[in-house]
UniProtKB/Swiss-Prot annotation:
GO terms for cellular component: extracellular region. It is found in: Secreted. Signal peptide: none annotated. Keywords: Secreted. The keyword Zinc does not apply. This is Venom peptide 7. Transmembrane segments: none annotated. Expressed by the venom gland. It comes from the Eukaryota.
Length: 12
């Protein structure tokens, strides 16, 4: 699961 990776990409 890469929810944190995706979320981080969106937050940036």
């Amino acid at each position: 699961v890469a929810i944190r990776i995706i979320w981080s990409d969106i937050q940036d």
